[in-house]
Amino acid sequence: MSDYKVNEATIAKKAELVDVYAQKMTEAASIVVADSRGLSVDQDTQLRKQLREAGVEFKVVKNSVLRRAAEKAGLEGLSEAFSGPSAVAFSNEDVVAPAKVLADFAKDAENLEIKAGVIEGKVSSKEEIQAIASLPSRDGLLSMLLSVLQAPVRNVALAVKAVAEKEESAA
């Protein structure tokens, strides 16, 4: 017989962690799982700063906790990404932000590898996450929409101004 005893307090803490991360996964607009092994302390600090500025939460969590949390959140397909060291980036606001920051950072830091992710509740592959990263941010998309909506009004204003100037010069 083994003298190993199960520590009830440790099990309770892990169950609580699973609940916390399952809730984060359920509420998140997007999640990106990455392997940040091999980043220097300076690179890791820079990455965390950029993610924080973008409103993204970045955590390194045990794979067993993440796997159970993903199952509890109904994201079973994400469990395959939890092998080797895993860091998870959560965003509740901007769907593109975690993918964009991590993909941009990975261009300079070869040791950062995106594994998979979740976009609005759908498990996505590494390739899909990188495609999302190439999209403009929410603010960028809104500014593009605004300029498209303003164009007809601007054209009408210019046409009215041209007619007014033509009539003034004719008079």
Curated annotation (Swiss-Prot):
One of its GO terms (cellular component) is large ribosomal subunit. GO terms for molecular function: large ribosomal subunit rRNA binding; structural constituent of ribosome. It holds the Pfam family Ribosomal_L10. It comes from the Bacteria. Keywords: Ribonucleoprotein, Ribosomal protein, RNA-binding, rRNA-binding. Disulfide bonds: none annotated. GO terms for biological process: translation. NCBIfam families: PRK00099.1-1. PANTHER family: 39S RIBOSOMAL PROTEIN L10, MITOCHONDRIAL. Part of the ribosomal stalk of the 50S ribosomal subunit. The N-terminus interacts with L11 and the large rRNA to form the base of the stalk. The C-terminus forms an elongated spine to which L12 dimers bind in a sequential fashion forming a multimeric L10(L12)X complex. Forms part of the ribosomal stalk, playing a central role in the interaction of the ribosome with GTP-bound translation factors. Belongs to the universal ribosomal protein uL10 family. This is Large ribosomal subunit protein uL10. It comes from Lactococcus lactis subsp. lactis (strain IL1403) (Streptococcus lactis). The gene is rplJ.
